[in-house]
């Protein structure tokens, strides 16, 4: 678990991964070298797994987004599902879930026909019994960074 200072540094980097250590230092009250040491430590411990950019999927030609519920044949391991789905560049996220489905995959496609082809290929995987999909009409909220649950959770 990150302490408050590390969390503020991570939040600053999540907002802008190109932000300088000096700029972050001004935000959190540390020198640039102190921020760098903390970032290096956070990378070494795996708290920071990389630095990236956020790109609008439509700018790359991904015009259609959907979620696919995957219902697996009995005794399918999460590792089998992961190996099956990681072959599809269109699958940008996948998780095992509670409820009737075994997993949910987020899929981007160039258009409806492309989405349909991806859905057919996923449904044809040996571990898949059936699928159910929903298409995104309008993304309402996408968060790439948030504070820790202890500080931000709305309690009763």
What are these regions (language model features)?
Residues 1-156:
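A compositional/biophysical signature of low hydrophobicity enriched in polar/charged and small residues
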